[in-house]
């Protein structure tokens, strides 16, 4: 649906909603205690009865009470809470938050790695009439201070002493709304208004059930429940206000479109919960369907994730592209150790897997005997080695997945479905599922939502605009930014560019703010160029196109290297794939330093050949890469070039490597 008529239809749909309210609310608000007009459809998907989060949770507890909900590892043993226990713990936490002085529509901040305590505090905050405010564990003290004051955080949950010290380093006068801090991991040092988790959970004993019920009953589906702070890759983080209805409606929509089954799903929680994608798939969807959530170890992103996957065998797995790329590299490394028949079988199976799954993607379900053999001999073993042998939904989100990785997994019978969404759309807006996906597409629009491509060019590329029950309430205390995002007819303008094919599959081509405009006035979207560079030159880990307002395009390149498993810092040593690339050229280099300091002629020549191949596919001379430089370290969360969800922070990179960029232009 790419035309504007849908705008009018969407606007008419609103007439059915909130008709009991004396003053009809608007589609947006910037007030923490504000109410919005819900975007209910007249009938069908999108017309479901609005629910508050307490109603939503209570309904699930009635259906799944004794089923396992949360699993936390204590030593070698998994400790399980069922849905009854989970709900009671949330009520207990809510009473304690009230006792500590949580005010209505004020924040409860959560700073730490995923855990049962994170979930219980998040839900408890909402039951108690506050707002759940996730804070990235990687945030600086300055960003934490901004979020705490902006969200009016009354109570803060921190994981450990390291996070506590970060907060204590902030002058107390700059943390005015904060009344108490709870720490949920030992050891713990004594401090004023600091509580251990166990002590905190006992604080609310004197609060009667009736008092909590009054707060719960006073809540409305069109009021704010969750604040998601954008990671601030381009400036000050914005507080995205999500209503009860945003959360409860989209949890149901995702469940239906992913074809998830009640009481049968298992997920592993490891991505930062302050990001809406992780929060939706780890907290809210499992409540909706009675799924079991296992908590990964805190060092999951540094190497232990696959061990957890092998132990718990999730049925649904969501990863960001860099996670899938790491797993891709691991499988390739292991397969390279195979010899003789085993190696031949792997190549044979991949060829069959790619052909069969490519046809399946187009709706042709032909499974020859050779495919069934490949499944038994190779695919099942690869999946078992990754802990994905029970998994039916393989998902990638937050950034585009590169083609090589997508095709590699497709050939191994692991079709990765990409999704597209924003914090402002409460998570996914389009999804791919096992029966409905295309390589490099973000899938189709969620049932009950609407899409519009605004100001399309001759190629059908336009700004992706969104409509539905999942559209956020507004940015907290920021009317200007809210009205820039939501137009007069209620469409959310994403700032992302995309196109739709004839079947309704969405392809995201870039971001309006990321488009480079050269000194000659040429518009160049960087992502397609960067993706092609990584495809043509296998030793390249990250590529960032530079050239805004400059006379030609240049590129920052990083090489694939090993990572420090404890800190996540990129090491100097090249990884397995990069070393293989070098040996194939006849280079004996084993470190980034050897290649960069000596300007290894074999590697530099191969990179230039790759750049030449990319330039041959350029639409015109203005889109050609004229110069490039290899940086001494790969991009990472540790170095600040990547955000918490491993998204490239272009503005930060441009500042950090200004000297190298300037050198290419002077």
From Swiss-Prot:
Residues reported in the UniProt entry to bind ATP: 230-238, 418-423, 496, 624
The EC number(s) this enzyme carries: 6.2.1.3, 6.2.1.15
Highest rank taxon of the organism: Eukaryota
Catalytic function, reaction form: a long-chain fatty acid + ATP + CoA = a long-chain fatty acyl-CoA + AMP + diphosphate; (5Z,8Z,11Z,14Z)-eicosatetraenoate + ATP + CoA = (5Z,8Z,11Z,14Z)-eicosatetraenoyl-CoA + AMP + diphosphate; hexadecanoate + ATP + CoA = hexadecanoyl-CoA + AMP + diphosphate; (9Z)-octadecenoate + ATP + CoA = (9Z)-octadecenoyl-CoA + AMP + diphosphate
GO cellular component, one term: cytoplasm
SUPFAM superfamilies hit by this protein: Acetyl-CoA synthetase-like
The protein, known as: Long-chain-fatty-acid--CoA ligase ACSBG2
Species of the source: Homo sapiens (Human)
Organism lineage string: Eukaryota, Metazoa, Chordata, Craniata, Vertebrata
């Amino acid at each position: 649906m790419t035309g504007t008529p849908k705008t009018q239809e969407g606007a008419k749909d609103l007439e059915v909603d909130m008709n009991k309210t004396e003053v009809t609310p608007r589609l947006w608000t910037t007030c923490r205690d504000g109410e919005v007009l819900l975007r209910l459809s007249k009938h069908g998907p999108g017309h479901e009865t609005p629910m508050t989060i307490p109603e939503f949770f209570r309904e699930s507890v009635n259906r799944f009470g004794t089923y396992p909900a949360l699993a936390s590892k204590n030593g070698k043993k998994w400790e399980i809470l069922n849905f009854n226990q989970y709900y009671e713990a949330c009520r207990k936490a809510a009473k304690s938050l009230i006792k500590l002085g949580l005010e209505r529509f004020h924040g409860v901040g959560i700073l730490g790695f995923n855990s049962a305590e994170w979930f219980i505090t998040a839900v408890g905050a909402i039951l108690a009439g506050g707002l759940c405010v996730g804070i990235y564990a990687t945030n600086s003290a300055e960003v934490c201070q901004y979020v705490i004051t902006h969200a009016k955080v009354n109570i803060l949950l921190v994981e450990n002493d390291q996070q506590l010290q970060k907060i204590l380093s902030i002058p107390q006068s700059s943390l005015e709304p904060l009344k108490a801090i709870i720490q949920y991991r030992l050891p713990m040092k004594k401090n004023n208004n600091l509580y251990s988790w166990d002590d905190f959970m006992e604080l609310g004993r004197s609060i009667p059930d009736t008092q909590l019920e009054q707060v719960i009953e006073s809540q409305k589906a069109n009021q704010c429940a969750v604040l998601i702070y954008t990671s601030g890759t381009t400036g000050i983080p914005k507080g995205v206000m999500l209503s009860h209805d945003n959360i409860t409606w989209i949890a149901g929509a995702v469940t239906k479109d992913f074809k998830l089954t009640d009481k049968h799903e298992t997920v592993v929680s490891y991505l930062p919960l302050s990001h809406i994608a992780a929060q939706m798939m780890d907290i809210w969807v499992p409540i909706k369907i009675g799924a079991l959530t296992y908590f990964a170890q805190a060092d999951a992103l540094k190497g232990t994730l696959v061990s957890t996957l092998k132990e718990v065998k999730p049925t649904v797995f969501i990863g960001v592209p860099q996670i899938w790329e790491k797993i891709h590299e691991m499988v390739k490394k292991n397969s390279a150790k195979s010899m003789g028949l085993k190696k031949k079988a792997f190549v044979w199976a991949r060829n069959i897997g790619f052909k069969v799954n490519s046809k399946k993607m187009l709706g042709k379900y032909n499974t020859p005997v050779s495919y069934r053999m490949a499944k038994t001999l190779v695919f099942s073993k690869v999946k078992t080695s990754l802990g994905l042998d029970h998994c039916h939904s393989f998902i990638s989100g937050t950034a585009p997945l590169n083609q090589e990785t997508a095709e590699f997994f497709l050939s191994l019978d692991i079709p990765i479905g990409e999704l597209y969404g924003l914090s402002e759309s409460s998570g996914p807006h389009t999804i791919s599922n096992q029966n409905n996906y295309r390589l490099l597409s973000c899938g189709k629009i969620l049932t009950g939502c609407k899409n519009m491509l605004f100001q399309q060019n001759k190629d059908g590329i336009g700004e992706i605009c969104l409509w539905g029950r999942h559209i956020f309430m507004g940015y907290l205390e920021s009317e200007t930014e809210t009205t820039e995002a939501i137009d007069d007819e209620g469409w959310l303008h994403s700032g992302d560019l995309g196109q739709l094919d004839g079947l309704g599959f969405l392809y995201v081509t870039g971001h309006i703010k990321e488009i480079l405009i050269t000194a000659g006035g040429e518009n160049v979207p960087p992502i397609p160029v960067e993706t092609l560079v990584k495809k043509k030159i296998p030793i390249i880990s990250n590529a960032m196109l530079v050239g805004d307002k400059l006379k030609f395009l240049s590129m920052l390149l990083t090489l694939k290297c090993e990572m420090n498993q404890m800190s996540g810092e990129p090491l100097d040593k090249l990884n397995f794939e990069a070393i293989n690339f070098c040996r194939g050229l006849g280079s004996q280099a084993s470190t980034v330093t050897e290649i960069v300091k000596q300007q290894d002629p074999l590697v530099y020549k191969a990179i230039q050949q790759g750049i030449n191949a990319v330039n041959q596919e350029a639409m015109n001379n203005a889109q050609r890469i004229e110069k490039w430089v290899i940086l001494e370290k790969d991009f990472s969360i540790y170095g600040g070039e990547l955000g918490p969800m491993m998204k490239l922070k272009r503005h930060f990179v441009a500042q950090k490597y200004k000297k190298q960029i300037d050198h290419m232009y002077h």
